[in-house]
Amino acid sequence: MIRISLTSIILVMLVSCKSMDDSQISIYLEKSSSYKAQITRDVWGVPHVYGKTDADAAFGLAYAHAEDDFKNIAENMYLYRAEMGLKDGIDGAIQDYLIKVLKIREQIDENYTNDLNADVRKVIEAYAAGINYWMIKNPSNGYNHFFPVTEKDIVAGFSIQNLFFSGVVSSIEKLQRESDLKEEYTSLYRNQEFVTGSNVLAVNSRKTHDQSTRIIINSHQPLDGPLAWYEAHVRSDEGWNMMGGLFPGSPFVFVGFNENIAWGFTVNKPDLSDSYLLEVNPENENQYLLDGEWVDFKIEMVRLPIKLFGPLKWTVKREAKYSVHGPVLEVADKSYALRFSGMSDIKQVNQWYAMNKSNSLEEWLEAMKMRSIISFNGVYADRKDNIYFLHNSSSPLRKEGID
């Protein structure tokens, strides 16, 4: 729980109707002028975006998506910037706390240039420029306080997706539930866990009457919110030619097809996260037992902006503790350190780009071997009659005998 005290609250004005700065507008108009894209729409309104380069196409994709569904793109920025408290109050600040404790934005700042390929950075930066160009052209969009959207906002979206699919959020919720129960009843929750996910079906010529290869993808996505599918076709002269579904704020197709291959994903929920029960020094709550010795937690302060009412917000300061295992979560009278696969990895963007540029089973599998996308079942089909199932999991190597 986030506790609010008068000494930790700063009352400030929230200017929700902030206008864009003229000097910034000039800067981002100049950036936008380096991209050229063509957007045409079919009878269903689906955008078909063409650009000479991948970056041009990404710029056009962002503009088309903003044209159709800017609300979901913009509201994702609350999450990507760890400002959900400004949208949902205390409940949103809990998500912000987790994102800030995990230092997701700091990792992106530190590793953006070294970990992301130059071609990938060009695409991400062009996509952010496309969103900003649409905002400039539509100044009454209601979300000018997010201008300018940056390339690092876009990367944060991919890192946070990894967080949500790592199982660490479910682990935290389970620890909170169990803290309210007698110990003998906690095992009941293990039997209540179940997997809900998506469907993908691939069939080749061995099972079809007309000797065709087909893939059917039904990913059970909502029509609104951060996981709402958006359908688009994006094509460039650099070999990018994908049509399918993507999330708000994503420059890459997540499930779909090109002229040679197609793939879909389903949720598989491998065991990717661990919680370490720490023994805290009864005489010093800022120490824990490590290899027979009491050692100090690393302690930092996290600032969480929270919407109050009208144009008012609070900034709450909360302590964050770190052990050698990872950030520490205090549940009731117990302290747990959290760790999960991919918690410091921002290379998901590289992998999605490589998959989008794949044109054969070999290329697609090579992209999947990156394993920066830490979970999902992959189902694949191609024009050469290949079908393939991949249980994808970036599972940690654990020492045997440890619970």
What are these regions (language model features)?
Residues M1-L6:
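Bacterial N-terminal signal peptides that target proteins for export
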Residues V15-S16:
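C-terminal motif of bacterial Sec signal peptides marking the signal peptidase cleavage site
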Residues D21-D403:
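Mature extracytoplasmic enzyme cores
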